[in-house]
Amino acid sequence: MSSSLADSINSLNSVALGEKKSDLVLTNCNLLSVYTREIIPKTQIAIINDRIAYVGPDATHTIGAKTKVIDIHNKFVSPGFADTHLHIDQFVLPSEFAKQSLLCGVTSLFLSLIHI
């Protein structure tokens, strides 16, 4: 494992355990659980270095003096979606397709490039 990846994992674990403080905490989230198909209200999300370190009912252990806390007022959050079967043909640039997919919450694409 590269040292930067190891450092990132250690940082995420430290925040999740409350040993290190997060950069950002989102409060009052309605979390869409893709496992149980339910909406989990009042979820809190702690973020460090643009990565999610903690998701749960109470992220106060991750909040420090420099942590920015944003109340998102019961808006919905969900994990990034993966599109596991698609084809891009010669009429669509892959970079443009990726941009449009992100707007729909798709963060992972598994595709077959056809005639590009």
Language-model features: locations:
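Histidine-rich, glycine-flanked metal-binding segment
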Residues: 4-24, 31-78
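Generic beta-strand/beta-sheet core signal
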Residues: 55, 111-112
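Conserved small/polar residues in nucleotide/adenosyl-binding loops
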Residues: 114-116
